A protein has these predicted regions:
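Phosphate/pyrophosphate-binding loop motifs in nucleotide- or prenyl diphosphate-using proteins
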Residues: 1-180
Length: 180
């Protein structure tokens, strides 16, 4: 009789998990923290996409989700078993950044988060993305993270910041006490 597949294995009940390749590590290992944070980012990106009516932006966010998933898988793998995001994916992201930046007025002051549900979700995605980048820097001190992945996540936080501004639709709220 064939055993039915199940979501639980009980192998992680002691606070460890397996990297792709079989090595057991603590669930608070920096690699696990990094790919877990990218998983969290993807969940927020899904919510962001669900709150946007612009099909072109939604399609691009879905492309981003695939790239974030690739980077997460790469961090979960031992050695160089998974492909990384390509330089073309970075170039695509930079093109979207350039388009958004060209459509927005220059910014001279800090702005507050918010500006409607979609803008607030973009800002939340940006902050989770920056946290993921910080954890990836930690991982890079333990084992090499491909440079393309580091660059992609760094650019993604820029994209999400500009997307937040774009979704604000010109109604940005300035910080009342700007740094001087």
């Amino acid at each position: 009789m064939e055993k039915k597949a199940t979501i639980y294995t009980a192998t992680g009940d002691n606070g460890t998990t397996s990297l792709v390749g079989g090595t057991r590590v603590s669930k608070n290992h920096p690699r696990v923290e990094a790919y877990g944070t990218l998983d969290e980012l993807n969940a927020h990106l899904g919510l962001l996409a669900a709150s946007i009516d612009d099909a072109r932006i939604v399609a691009f966010i879905e492309e981003v989700e695939n790239n974030v998933m690739t980077i997460g898988c790469e961090l979960a793998c031992e050695g160089n078993k998974m492909p990384t995001v390509s330089k073309e994916k970075i170039t695509s992201l930079e093109r979207e950044i350039d388009k958004l930046e060209a459509s927005l007025p220059p910014m001279h002051e800090f702005i507050l988060p918010g500006g409607g549900e979609a803008a607030a979700r973009a800002n939340l995605c940006r902050t989770v993305c920056r946290r993921a980048e910080r954890v990836m820097v930690t991982v890079n001190g333990i084992c090499q993270v491909p440079q393309e992945s580091m660059v992609y996540i760094n650019r993604l936080s820029d994209y999400l910041f500009l997307l937040q501004r774009f979704l604000y639709n010109g109604k940005e709220k300035k910080w009342e006490k700007p740094c001087k």
